[in-house]
Amino acid sequence: VTDLRARRHRETRAEIVAAGLRLFDEHGYDAVTMEQIAAAAGVSRRTLYRHFPAKDRILLDLPLEWMAMWDDVVAAAPADLPPRDVVERAARVIGAHLDAEAGRIGIAWRIIDSVPALEPAFLANPTWTERVVAVMEDPARGAPLDRRIAVIVAGAYLGALDAAMLAWAAGAGGDTVADTIELIIERLAPIWP
């Protein structure tokens, strides 16, 4: 019963996110109401608000997926894998996912780019920075990096990724997210200590 309940919870969230993205894309983020999203998703307002207390939380569901992927890759990485390899592996996994979900990811990034108030929640934020820094400071992965250096490296990666994703969503970012991630990995390799 618990597995069924958890699966239904995930399915409902996915239906709400899909409906929200579709409406945001068709009508603009600011023009869409929570009531319209509930109707388009085929759920009650109560169900919608139980899953997402505000409109921006529907968009925030996407980076939360990516954070969960990041956490899974980091947890599955051998303890002695160097931090750079762990960070690059996680970035590649997320990039492949973003390419597989290019339609909805592109819509989300275009919305983020068109609504400046949403950008701080999505772009290189402290939560992402701390996840990357934690990998670099992990003593099991070798000598931990000085925190200042770890924050600088994390900021460089995340800033480059944010800029690349905004360009990609606008149609100027190249072929795939995976290609862009490879370019970032290649160009930023010299900053690793």
Indicate where each model-derived feature is located.
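C-terminal peripheral helix-coil segments that are non-catalytic and often amphipathic
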Residues: V133-D138, A170-P193
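Basic, helix-initiating cap at the start of DNA-binding domains
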Residues: V1-V43, L60
